[in-house]
Regions:
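Auxiliary Fe-S-binding modules of radical SAM enzymes
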Residues: 1-91, 248-256, 262-351
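Canonical Radical SAM [4Fe-4S] cluster-binding loop centered on the CxxxCxxC motif
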Residues: 99-136, 142
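A short loop-to-beta-strand scaffold at the N-terminal edge of the catalytic core in hydrolase folds
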Residues: 92-97
């Protein structure tokens, strides 16, 4: 049975290649092709002999080469590309490439589906099927990086904001981020990495203890207990007041500002009173607020508030000296909400 090479450390790669009959120095060459040049086929590694390539192809697989793109959507401005990737076991996740003036970001999933049950999210419609491995998280990045290297560019930022709760797959997520930080991979700064959580406090505490300057984003979406429970059942186990306290400990240890994400849902959590409640909880905190007008999710029945309502909410926060912005629209014309592309594909397969 062939062994998977993608996502291994250089030492692990050396051990496998030597055991297969290759010279030890070949591991460094393969490593460079995989993680610096984003080549995911052995026969494209031009400084390897035909005999070495034959050994590699006979004994090993490369995960990115096995991924199947089930669906792909590109925004009209060509700045956002969203794909539904199928893994060899038949499970699929969404991942997104976003082109910015300042670089190229990839939004990755950490689980197949999600168990958090957030009312506004399509990712949890079928629950969490399984965690992704670190290699599967990395493969999402390298699928897009292989496209960018042909343009002389590379992925410069990663946000763990796709399907799944990253803090419930902590080791794999951190393993993938640490891998990308290595000098012989993408050498990505931790300051260009963001983990978004719905508020799993033990995970926030573990991240604090690591002491890495990774950006932390908290999915808040309501600052009133009953409403947050309605929107995010996780609030029953981890009340948002305690989540904010854990986030402040993270700030104190790392010096990094925490971002609070707040999806504005028409008639639900978008009133001036809701804005005042949010400001009361975040005042004097080392925090910023990212307001996100809701992407309509047909399965949930939620709608986007008007521009006037969004601006009124923003003004309340600014009045209280809260650093707040409205997320720039980059993919309104595609299935942008988390889980929508996967849910749409699943529905098509049933019809």
């Amino acid at each position: 049975m062939k062994k998977e090479l993608f996502g291994l450390s250089l030492i692990e790669l050396q051990e496998l290649l030597v055991a297969a009959g290759l010279k030890k120095f070949r591991a460094a060459q393969v490593y460079q092709w995989l993680y610096q040049k984003s080549v995911t086929a052995f026969d494209q590694m031009r400084n390897l002999s035909k005999a070495d390539i034959a050994i590699l192809e006979a004994n090993f697989t490369l995960l990115p080469q096995q991924l199947k793109i089930l669906r792909e959507q590109v925004s009209q401005d060509d700045l956002t590309r969203k794909v539904l990737l199928e893994f060899p076991d038949g499970n699929s996740v969404e991942t997104v490439l976003m082109r910015h003036d300042y670089g190229y970001s990839v939004c990755v999933s950490s689980q197949v589906g999600c168990d958090m049950g957030c009312a506004f999210c399509a990712s949890g419609l079928s629950g969490c099927i399984r965690n992704l491995t670190a290699a599967e998280i990395l493969a999402q990045v390298y699928i897009f990086n292989s496209m960018l290297v042909r343009e002389g560019k590379q992925v410069s930022r990663i946000v763990v904001m796709g399907s799944g709760e990253p803090m419930l797959n902590f080791d794999a997520v951190i393993g993938a981020l640490q891998f990308l930080h290595q000098e012989n991979t993408l050498y990505m700064s931790y300051r260009n990495m963001t983990i978004s959580t719905c508020g799993i406090i033990p995970g926030i505490e573990k991240l604090t203890q690591l002491g890495l300057p990774i950006n932390l984003a908290i999915s808040l979406h309501a600052a009133e207990p009953e409403l947050r429970i309605e929107l995010m059942p996780v609030n029953k186990g981890f009340p948002f007041q305690d989540v904010i306290q854990a986030a402040e400990a993270y700030v104190g240890y790392t010096g990094r500002q925490v971002t609070y994400e707040y999806i504005l849902i028409a008639g639900k959590n978008d009133s001036p009173v809701a804005a005042e409640l949010l400001a009361n909880h975040l005042r004097f905190k080392h925090a910023s607020v990212n307001l996100i007008p809701a992407n309509p999710v047909p399965e949930k029945g939620f709608e986007r508030p008007s521009k006037k309502v969004v601006e009124a909410f923003l003004k309340v926060l600014q009045k209280h000296k809260i650093n707040a912005t409205v997320r720039r629209e980059m993919c309104k014309d595609i299935d942008a909400a988390c889980g929508q592309l996967r849910a749409r594909f699943a529905q098509e397969q049933q019809d």
